[in-house]
């Protein structure tokens, strides 16, 4: 289907738009009644590996909310299966790695990712969506540090002690792990673009655990290589992290056409720091649990803080939480659409 709404593509290029485009991280998920109904029939891996069902889930918020972009429904750990990682997605916990990568043997056991063989269902989902979507489709992948955190820790972590111990204690091995993950995610993202994704987002959900000095030494060179390898894909790339206020300048230097801001980052400060670089964000997801008067106030605050500058994609500072009322998400979209009314 030909795009009838290219607002997000124009904003990602820093071009003027009549209003900010709006979409939400985790816009297809447990807060939706229709999604919960599907989950009664399918597990998360079953949805992701069934292109027809996965396309249906990806389309849910486009139809229900009127957002300006769809984001491929998947998990950031999806490509790890194709690298030989034994993992499970545990409800209310997240990915659990049954063969954690903590030594040279574990790193060398990671296979090169061949997306067409390892995740053909992801690419077929994209092709289906491109026939049906009136708005751009965002493909995505986890950033190397965030994926390394899962692999080394064995699952979600709060203190990241194991991953930091490897990083500090065996630096050469750490860089080898990051090189493997960088190459794998570059292939994965390029394959998504070739299948039809209009934009890409790199999620570095846990990189805020690092100091700026550690980011520069242990992560930034790999992110630079990742973004350089994505240039031939010819689509805009969003670079997003959580807890990254102190890393934003380095993240900008590492690459990406758009910088995603979490809700702890003051928007005026970020825009001054980043100059002409387009930004995405950054409403606190918890605001969507509040009364509509508060939601309106906070949405208007963010729009005012942006000051009408080009290159602003409205989003949350993190993903929609499951407790969120659907009507409140729809209300945010309506508020943004009022800007151009």
From Swiss-Prot:
Keywords, alphabetical: Cytoplasm, Decarboxylase, Lyase, Porphyrin biosynthesis
EC category name: lyase
GO terms of biological process kind: protoporphyrinogen IX biosynthetic process
EC number in record: 4.1.1.37
Location in the cell: Cytoplasm
Signal peptide stretch: none
Pfam families membership: URO-D
GO CC annotation terms, alphabetical: cytosol
Catalysed reactions listed for this entry: uroporphyrinogen III + 4 H(+) = coproporphyrinogen III + 4 CO2
Binding site for substrate: 26-30, 75, 150, 205, 318
Pathway where this protein functions: Porphyrin-containing compound metabolism; protoporphyrin-IX biosynthesis; coproporphyrinogen-III from 5-aminolevulinate: step 4/4
Domain of life: Bacteria
Residues with site note (Transition state stabilizer): 75
Main location: cytoplasm
GO molecular function: uroporphyrinogen decarboxylase activity
Main function: Catalyzes the decarboxylation of four acetate groups of uroporphyrinogen-III to yield coproporphyrinogen-III.
Subunit structure, as described in the record: Homodimer.
Membership in a protein family: Belongs to the uroporphyrinogen decarboxylase family.
Protein's name according to its UniProt entry: Uroporphyrinogen decarboxylase
Source organism phylogeny: Bacteria, Thermotogati, Deinococcota, Deinococci, Thermales
């Amino acid at each position: 289907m030909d795009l009838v709404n290219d607002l997000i593509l124009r904003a990602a290029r820093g071009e003027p738009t009549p209003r900010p485009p709006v979409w939400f991280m985790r816009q297809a998920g447990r807060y939706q009644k229709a999604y919960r109904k599907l989950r009664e029939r399918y597990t998360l891996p079953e949805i992701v590996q069934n292109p027809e069902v996965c396309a249906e889930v990806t389309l849910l918020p486009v139809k229900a909310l009127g957002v300006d972009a769809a984001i491929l429904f998947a998990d950031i750990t999806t490509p790890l299966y194709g690298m030989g990682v034994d993992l499970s997605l545990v409800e209310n916990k997240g990915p659990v790695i049954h063969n954690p990568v903590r030594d040279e043997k574990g790193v060398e056991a990671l296979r090169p990712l061949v997306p067409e063989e390892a995740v053909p269902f992801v690419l077929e989902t994209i092709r289906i969506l491109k026939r049906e979507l009136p708005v751009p489709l965002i493909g995505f992948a986890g950033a190397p540090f965030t994926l390394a955190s899962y692999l080394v820790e064995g699952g979600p972590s709060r203190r990241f002690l194991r991953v930091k111990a490897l990083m500090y204690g065996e630096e050469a091995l750490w860089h080898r792990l990051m090189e493997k993950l960088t190459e794998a995610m570059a292939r994965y993202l390029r394959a998504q673009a070739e299948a039809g994704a209009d934009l890409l987002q790199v999620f570095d959900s846990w990189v805020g655990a690092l100091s700026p000095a550690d980011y520069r030494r242990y992560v930034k060179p790999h992110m630079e290589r990742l973004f350089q390898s994505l240039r031939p894909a010819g689509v805009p790339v969003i670079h997003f992290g959580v807890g990254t206020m102190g890393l934003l300048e380095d993240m900008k230097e590492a690459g990406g056409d758009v910088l995603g801001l979490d809700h702890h980052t003051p928007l005026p400060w970020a825009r001054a720091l980043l100059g002409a670089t387009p930004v995405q964000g950054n409403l606190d997801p918890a605001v969507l649990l509040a009364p509509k008067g508060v939601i309106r106030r906070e949405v208007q605050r963010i729009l005012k803080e942006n000051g009408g500058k080009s290159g602003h994609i409205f989003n949350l500072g993190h993903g929609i939480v499951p407790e969120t009322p659907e009507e409140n998400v729809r209300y945010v979209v309506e508020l943004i659409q009022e800007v151009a009314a």
